[in-house]
Amino acid sequence: MKIRYSVLSTFIISALYSQDTQANLKHQCLLRVPHFAGEEITADQLNMPIEIEADRAVINQPKEANYSGNVTIKQGNRSIFADNVRIEQQAPQHRKAFLIGRYQYQDNLIQAEGHNALLDLQSKDAEVANTTYQLVGRQGRGEAESGQFTPQTRRLKNASFTACLLNDNAWSIEANEMVQHIKAGYAEMWHARFKIFDVPIFYSPYLQFPLGDQRRSGILTPKLYHSTKDGLIYSQPFYWNIAPNMDATFTSNYYSRRGWQINPEFRYLTALGQGILAGEYLANDRLDTYRPKDMNDRRYLFHWRHNMSFLTDWHLDVDYTNVSDRRYFSDFDSSYGNVTDGYALQHFKLGYYQPQYNLSISGKDFHTFDSFDNVKPYRVLPQIDFNYYQDQFLKDSRFSFFAQIARFENDSKSMPNAWRFHAEPIINIPFVNHYGSLNFETKLYASHYQQQKGENQTAEEVKKQLTRIIPQVKLDFQTVLEADKSLFSGFKQILEPRLQYVYRPYRDQSEIGSKSHESVGLGYDSALLQTDYYSLFNDRRYSGLDRISSANLITAGASTRFFNKKTGEEVFNISVGQTYYLRPSRVDSLAIDSTADRSSSWSVESNWRFQPKWNWHASYQYDTRLHKSSLANMSLQYKPSTENVFQLNYRYVNEDYINQNLSFNRYGQDIKQIGGMIGWNLTDKVAIMASHYRDIALKKAVETQLSLNYNTCCWSANLYVARQLTTTPIGAKDSIRNFYYDNKFGINFELRFGHDYSSGMHKMLSKGILPYVEQYGIN
């Protein structure tokens, strides 16, 4: 598995110009459709007066009137222009207009032209013949042999429809009968023929498609790809608009080398909360080249995301993902996980919240994908947390209290299980004046463990009862200084020094948890935290509560910021810090868990916006123990608009740093990652995304992508080519020098019905195992 150590490689593409593509394309498309002139009337138009103008009129009161020569009839939003019009009135509530010869009809929804028509002036119904029509204010036009118009529907015989503009026959749909539902925003067709450039390519006895941007049930645009690993991939989604507050998508994926996969996704928003319920299921995976023999050929994923607030102060959060096997995300592209994640989270939390306290019960489990150790992380169920806050405890002091009860269980019979009871009172006394702030904090960690030996006979012995009490004292000084003279003219400089002292006595914690399986962490839920400038000022080196290292240390750091005097915007910042250990920090008697040196790594963070459209970020760590660089990364981005971006990235991790922080290291050398990506709208119709990632230490490419989108007013096309690092096939060599790739190719077309003008850039940037990420720490 080399994907987790994948790296970037330089990819530079120059672009000539950019525009707000979506807005420009929409403007160009709508510029060529008719628009309603004047102010739209929303009142009941049946009771509004009818205005008639003509060159000549012969009126036979009260039953008949004949008008000829430039006849114009107006009532509310609708207007009629005709050569000759005869109006008959059999009764006060029965008035009809016969349009003889050529006519034009227009209201706020449709414009039509044809020969001979009958209009009911009382009900707004109309019967037309040999007509061409164009929707008003939106794309959509067609022809019909005959039709019946009502305020709710337009029923057409031997009709056609297309969202393409005039003189563009890229695609059209013809049907024996068509019903356009005006308010609902969709059309139904019977005996429909789909044509491309007037050539019929598809027939359906029934078809439904949208006329606007309202959600409608129906078949969505399919996708077709080819992969050297999976073969031909055909994806056909179906959308079901169940109700205004819930819908679903059913996607059927066909892999020529694997079989059929069914992917349902249900979305809801109810009084019981909002969320997503989804699944992916492949009954029989035929591709055993990438599936171990002991792995079931039934591949599946289940995902549930739910948020709920109820009874004012209660909140429920569920995030649950489960997969059939550890290689699932390596074999299938999924919206609910990525091959680089390393695990699937299974978590729930029910909480009660008040201004001064909160109480919650939760559970957490991790479905890990590593195959290095049969022992997996601990499952926490239940975990009960209590927090209490009081701002005015003694004068200006602040008191807080944290308590937790947690049960840890492991699926491995050789691992111990435990109950943990923890209490943590905290008192903060701040001293603030115009020189700065000094915060004095005292804290007590009080923990009690009830441990149980694993059920296997070979399980290691553990101490059944264990109590650990650790006091802590912390002083944290911060101030903000404004320089009288900045280093650079036109900028205001701010200096933010920070000095922190932390003291905790040493307690041997080697009896907490297992001693022989540190690959799952230390104790039950602790792991060494990655360090950067901001983490230097954390209280602890380890996550969780099972490892609380001794501390007698001083952390010193400073940040300086430069602000543009004219705009007030932050332009540049840099932060430098280091921790000095007055005594080594320990959690047990092992040297590997101790800070032998007197000082930590130097940490540097910097951000620079040297132009409004340019951003630069860098971080660096120098390990004083190793006497070499341990971590470094840099990112440079040019982003002139929301859909135009160019980014270069570099990341370095020292091999010794990896060995120090991981109990296993299959990489065996430094990580050196370099690469770049570009997403650019070349014109209003053409958008491109390209990326290349390379491991310069191993001299191997990790991922190369090229995606090209062509957009018009009524259709779009996407070309996608990729070469991606994939997992090692079963039985193949698996060393740091062996790489295996999956080549992908696809061309997809999408019909547009006049409500989507996007360039597709967001979708293109999210593709790949290393998608686009924007992260710059500047205000």
UniProtKB/Swiss-Prot annotation:
UniProt main location, coarse: membrane
Pfam family, one: LptD
Alphabetized UniProt keyword annotations: Cell outer membrane, Membrane, Signal
Cellular component, GO, one term: transporter complex
Localization (cell): Cell outer membrane
Signal sequence segment: 1-23
GO biological process, one term: lipopolysaccharide transport
Keyword check for Membrane: yes
Keyword Membrane attributed: yes
Assembly description: Component of the lipopolysaccharide transport and assembly complex. Interacts with LptE and LptA.
Family (UniProt): Belongs to the LptD family.
Job of this protein: Together with LptE, is involved in the assembly of lipopolysaccharide (LPS) at the surface of the outer membrane.
Protein name per Swiss-Prot or TrEMBL: LPS-assembly protein LptD
